[in-house]
Amino acid sequence: MIVRNVKDVIGTQDEVRTDTWVSRRVLLKKDGMGFSFHETTIFPGGRTHIHYKNHLEAVWCIEGDGSIETIADGKKYELGPGVVYALNEHDEHWLCGGKEPLRVICVFNPPLTGQEVHDADGVYALPAEAQAA
């Protein structure tokens, strides 16, 4: 059994910070669960281009506000407590912080290894062993 407190991730290599978000990666590939589980905060006013070509992601909004806008069709969805969205089609999108920090719980498949950040195309790269398969 794995039991962790998200507070124990703060200040470790499993807390990844950019200009627009901070992600506390509580379960990772090394944990062998087949998915990764993160608590992420989107900063107010931030705007992040994301296109997970290699991963599927489900997101549960816990507190705060923001929006997500799909690039293909320009549809915009407001985000707040209780909203769940799933990027089941590798949807390219803009994730935008609102007036308050947006705290979300994220699940990724395949699982992240821990240090991923979005590249210039908004993508998380696959680990080397997955690319070779």
UniProtKB/Swiss-Prot annotation:
Keyword Nucleotide-binding annotated: no
Catalysed reaction, written as an equation: (2S)-4-acetamido-2-aminobutanoate = L-ectoine + H2O
Pathway given in the UniProt record: Amine and polyamine biosynthesis; ectoine biosynthesis; L-ectoine from L-aspartate 4-semialdehyde: step 3/3
SUPFAM superfamilies the record matches: RmlC-like cupins (SSF51182)
Record's protein name: L-ectoine synthase
GO molecular function, one term: ectoine synthase activity
Function: Catalyzes the circularization of gamma-N-acetyl-alpha,gamma-diaminobutyric acid (ADABA) to ectoine (1,4,5,6-tetrahydro-2-methyl-4-pyrimidine carboxylic acid), which is an excellent osmoprotectant.
Key words, A-Z: Lyase
Family recorded in the similarity comment: Belongs to the ectoine synthase family.
NCBIfam families per record: PRK13290.1 (NF009806)
GO biological process: ectoine biosynthetic process
EC main group: lyase
Keyword DNA repair: no
EC number: 4.2.1.108
Organism superkingdom: Bacteria
Gene source species: Bordetella petrii (strain ATCC BAA-461 / DSM 12804 / CCUG 43448)
Membrane-crossing segments per the record: none
